[in-house]
A protein has these predicted regions:
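12-transmembrane solute porter fold
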Residues: 16-31, 36-38, 51, 168, ...
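Intrinsic disorder in cytosolic terminal tails and internal cytosolic loops
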Residues: 1-14, 196-211, 451-454, 482-510
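C-terminal membrane-cytosol helix-exit motif in multi-pass small-molecule transporters
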Residues: 178-198, 224-236, 253-268, 477-487
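Alpha-helical transmembrane bundle and helix-membrane interface signal
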Residues: 135-136, 194-198, 210, 234-248, ...
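Membrane-interface helix termini and inter-helical loops of multi-pass transporters
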Residues: 45-46, 232-243, 309-314, 369-371, ...
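Short, membrane-exposed interhelical loops at transmembrane-helix boundaries
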Residues: 445-461
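Flexible interhelical linker loops that connect adjacent transmembrane helices
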Residues: 9, 185-224, 266-281, 342, ...
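Transmembrane-helix bundle of Major Facilitator Superfamily
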Residues: 2-191, 337, 344, 352-358, ...
Length: 510
């Protein structure tokens, strides 16, 4: 009995050691993504470039991560998730150091590309490794703990960056990333077991003499091109008109590349992403509601700083403290939601989460110039709680609908839906507010709104339209969440698609 308890305790300890090793890398990578927003002005001044040019520091990161995440997830499923994780940490650290040493802005952007490749590798495998380390009946707890870690990293980024930049140059922020990355690498090398984190049928098995499937280079290329076209079109870094020939060509390119990707994947015996997953109502509805949820969440975080500073007159430090409430609510709710979903199932929690999400968005749509700050703070905290409540069980439902050997690419696809939701949410909020203001004669930078009472009124009109739009999207996500019926236990095996659907090539059963 004592020996049995000892083994159980050691298994529990190994599980949490592996989680901590992965969590350190998650915190560092997410921290790096949010800290850079605070440093953009300093970077622009140092290199003597415009704020429009320095925005590529962020854009190139979104492009590379979004384009490479699914291919990296599939590669990890084939060659081993631990390998991809460790190589990603090395690339991320090398890119961070190269950013500091870059003598020109162009080389600094190239270094950011290297960082983003490492970040994509880390995001692609992190979720899958955590789910693989924990037993199926603790999947919610695992994802809840992961989401809390992400919330911590996201919240720490702008706060720490603000303090550091008061005393040190912007390069110090990237040097700060190196010590935790070293710790994450050593911990990952020591505590991550490839056979455990890759699971049965993944890369670990390839070393034992099992046949390794061919990598779907065509699918990876087409998906990367389609996602790159989508991110560039929606983010519109060149500020071209939405009816301009450039924009029309971009939209056509998105449609053509997406159709080509789907056609290609359906014809492959070993596709990068099994499109048959979408025949599962649980998978397809959970993925759609997840994307809609992140569109609404990003709209909040994009417009809220402008509202707090330009409309309510808060200082930057106070604004950061108010915005922290969203991350606090998400972190607290995610941890509890994960544990509760293991006991009571995913559906009640993500239905409740989307309901609260829609309520808080509707409340934010009603805000004006004369509002008590505590009302704003309560709505932001509630929005964070909602995000924590629906995010974790929603992810658990998605991962629970696919076989374990596909967790890498599906975990990467989950993170991709978050990134695309973020891009779409920011684009929607910006397009609505800027469009309404321009229609009222205020074609000015958002940072200069507070100096003009008429501009404030126009901004608030656009604000209400934008939040009304994302409230509608959140209600749609709530309806999908209500219809989602996650299946407990292991997912059923995938049935092959009819030969007619794949041009006569029948995919190999998985």
């Amino acid at each position: 009995m004592t020996e049995s308890k000892g083994r159980a305790a050691e298994v529990e300890a190994q599980k949490w050691r592996a989680f901590i090793a992965i969590a350190i890398s998650f915190v560092t990578m997410v921290f790096s993504m949010t800290m850079v927003f605070v440093a953009l002005s300093a970077i622009a001044d140092d290199f003597g470039v415009t704020l429009g040019a320095v925005s590529w520091v962020v854009i190139v990161q979104s492009l590379v991560i979004s384009a490479l995440m699914m291919p990296m997830g599939r590669i990890a499923d084939m060659v081993g998730r631990r390998r991809v994780h460790l190589v990603g940490l090395v690339l991320f650290a090398a890119g961070s150091l190269a950013v500091v040493l870059a003598p020109t802005f162009e080389l600094m952007i190239a270094a950011r590309v290297v960082m983003a490749v490492g970040n994509a590798m880390g995001q692609a495998v992190g979720t899958a490794m955590i789910v693989a380390v924990f037993p199926a009946n603790e999947r919610g707890k695992a994802l809840g703990s992961q989401t809390s870690v992400v919330a911590i990293g996201a919240a720490m980024g702008p706060i720490v960056a603000g303090f550091v930049l008061q005393a040190l140059p912007w390069e110090a922020l990237f040097l700060m990333l190196l010590p935790p990355l070293l710790v994450a690498f050593v911990a990952g090398y020591r505590y991550l077991d490839e056979a455990v984190v890759s699971g049965a049928g993944a890369g670990a098995g390839a070393d034992a003499g099992h046949a390794r499937p061919d990598f779907d280079w065509g699918g990876a290329t087409l998906s990367a091109l389609a996602i790159t076209a989508l991110v560039l079109t929606v983010s519109n870094p060149l500020a071209v008109g939405w009816t301009s020939p450039t924009m029309v060509v971009s939209v056509v390119a998105i449609v053509v590349l997406t159709a080509a990707f789907i056609s290609w994947e359906l014809r492959q015996p070993e596709p990068m992403l099994q499109l048959r997953f979408f025949t599962s109502p649980t998978f397809s509805m959970a993925v759609t509601s997840r994307t809609l949820g992140f569109v609404g969440s990003t709209a909040v975080m994009f417009l809220m700083p402008i509202y707090l500073i330009s409309v309510l007159g808060l200082r930057e430090a106070s604004t950061g403290a108010v915005l922290f409430l969203t991350s606090l609510g998400m972190g607290l709710a995610a941890n509890q939601a994960g544990r509760s979903s293991d006991r009571f199932g995913e559906r009640p929690l993500f239905v409740a989460g989307f309901a609260i999400h829609a309520f808080t968005l509707a409340g934010l749509a009603l805000l004006g110039q004369e509002v008590a700050l505590w009302v704003v703070m309560a709505l932001l905290f509630g929005n964070g709680v909602a995000l924590g409540l629906w995010n974790v069980p929603n992810g658990s439902a998605i991962l629970g609908a696919v076989p374990s050997e596909h967790l890498g690419v599906v975990g990467a696809f989950m993170n991709l839906t978050r990134n695309l939701g973020n891009v779409l949410g920011q684009a929607l909020a910006s397009a609505v507010v800027v469009g309404v203001m321009a229609a009222r004669g205020f074609d000015i930078p958002l940072s200069k709104i507070g100096a003009n009472p008429g501009a404030v009124t126009a901004f608030l009109h656009g604000w209400r339209i934008a939040y009304a739009a994302v409230t509608v999207l959140s209600v749609l996500a709530l309806a999908l969440a209500w219809l989602t019926r996650p299946t407990p236990g292991s997912p059923p095996p995938l049935a092959p698609l009819p030969a007619s659907a794949v041009g006569g090539v029948r995919p190999r059963p998985t």
